[in-house]
Amino acid sequence: MTITKLLLASIDEAYDRRSWHGTNLRGSLRGVTSGQAAWRPADDGHNIWELVVHAAFWKYDIRRRLGGEKGRSFALEGSNFWARPIEGTMAEWKADLLLLQREHDALRRAVEAFPAARWAKKAPGKPFMFEGLARGVAAHDLYHAGQIQLLKRLQN
């Protein structure tokens, strides 16, 4: 198996494919309503909705780094964490879930297109290799999947 295929497998398992580790990011979001997504554990704590948009942003950021893109902006103004919800409607929640899916699909395409010889090269401005960016986005998805699972349990 090539490094690209291994990285894609890790990214997919962390996002929406079955794996030994349990719930992935998409699985943690299955059946979550806009109300559940908006629930906040504390005044200064992030809710599920904010974690979804945050995960979408970092998929976008890593895709940009892999593709060497400059000047393009994320679908939402700002970076890292956005206050959510704005309206709190199911339509708004579904739109942000779709944003996450679109960014995941775009990231997959960027990983597939990335030259295999460059995975071991250092990412510009970063202390780690491109391969670490791809592995990191998978770890990031699983980290937040765990947070989401905990937030759901706290609501019960």
Where do the PLM segments sit?
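Acidic/histidine-rich alpha-helical segments that form the ligand environment
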Residues: 83-121, 132-137
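Short, contiguous alpha-helical
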Residues: 1-4, 8-22, 26-29, 34-83, ...
